[in-house]
Swiss-Prot record:
Protein name, entry field: Mediator of RNA polymerase II transcription subunit 4
InterPro entries for the chain: Mediator_Med4
A single GO cellular-component term on record: core mediator complex
GO MF term set: transcription coregulator activity
Location, primary (coarse class): nucleus
Subunit structure: Component of the Mediator complex.
Keywords of the record: Activator, Coiled coil, Nucleus, Transcription, Transcription regulation
Bias-annotated ranges (Basic and acidic residues): 189-217
Annotated segments matching region Disordered: 188-234
Function field: Component of the Mediator complex, a coactivator involved in the regulated transcription of nearly all RNA polymerase II-dependent genes. Mediator functions as a bridge to convey information from gene-specific regulatory proteins to the basal RNA polymerase II transcription machinery. Mediator is recruited to promoters by direct interactions with regulatory proteins and serves as a scaffold for the assembly of a functional preinitiation complex with RNA polymerase II and the general transcription factors.
Localization in the cell: Nucleus
Pfam families associated with the record: Med4 (PF10018)
Coiled-coil stretches noted in the UniProt entry, renumbered to this chain: 71-124
Length: 234
């Protein structure tokens, strides 16, 4: 009844097979012990066989345990190597990505250099006259030159009036009123009740007639002689 576990199976299968064999041997051993002695069969011989099979199975189990330990250690090292390889792969991917970016940048620099070289060669083949360049620069200077500072330019006193203009007074008032041309405005406390403005009734002016026979002309213009003294002298 001796049983040898084949080493070709994986460790979990070998362990399960060994434990099953030991369970069967122990059940057979308990059956022999519990059964009454039979004179026709030798009980002692059967007990010795079961005991020997249990010893062999136990030795096989100890070997399997050692083998599983070595297997687990090898698997742990394999996992470490796998993680290390994954990290190296990420680094390699990053390096490849940066190399690709550098390659594109280098190609752009080469293209720009080739275009610059073509422009230089074209300018050498077709030089622009100095007069044309000066005329172009003078036409651009009207729009690109910086304005002359008022501190350096001569001051024309004839263009300034001895009194402030209306615009300067308005600008001064605008600065004082912080941007409002309509005055400071109404102020009040938040939540304060404001009285409604009273309506002012428009009253028509009463026309007084000096004489009942004369007609009142509102559009009449009266010219008064203010130089009465001069008229008297004349």
């Amino acid at each position: 009844m001796a049983h040898t576990t084949p080493r070709s199976h994986p460790p979990p299968h070998s362990l399960l097979q060994n434990l099953t064999t030991q369970s069967l041997l122990l059940s057979h051993l308990f059956t022999l012990i519990a059964s009454p002695p039979n004179p026709n069969t030798s009980t002692q011989t059967q007990l010795n066989q079961v005991y020997s099979a249990l010893q062999l199975s136990t030795l096989d189990l100890s070997g399997l345990v050692k083998e599983v330990g070595h297997h687990q250690e090898a698997y742990r090292r394999l996992v470490e190597k796998k993680n290390e390889v994954a990290g190296l792969e990420m680094r390699v991917r990053g390096l490849v990505k940066r190399l690709e970016e550098g390659r594109k940048e280098l190609e752009g620099m080469i293209d720009q250099g080739e275009r610059s070289l073509e422009d230089i060669q074209k300018s050498e083949r077709e030089p622009v006259p100095a007069k044309t360049l000066m005329a172009h620069a003078q036409s651009l200077s009207k729009h690109s030159s910086a304005p002359v500072s008022s501190l350096l330019a001569p001051v024309d006193k004839a263009q300034y009036a001895p009194w402030p203009t209306e615009m300067s007074m308005r600008m001064g008032l605008l600065f004082q009123l912080e941007g409002s041309m309509s005055g400071m405005g109404e102020r009040g406390v938040v939540g304060e009740e404001q009285k409604a403005p009273q309506k002012v009734e428009e009253r028509r002016e009463h026309v007084e007639h000096e004489e009942s026979g004369r007609r009142y002309d509102p559009n009449a213009v009266f010219q008064l002689d203010l130089n009465s003294d001069e008229s008297d002298e004349d």
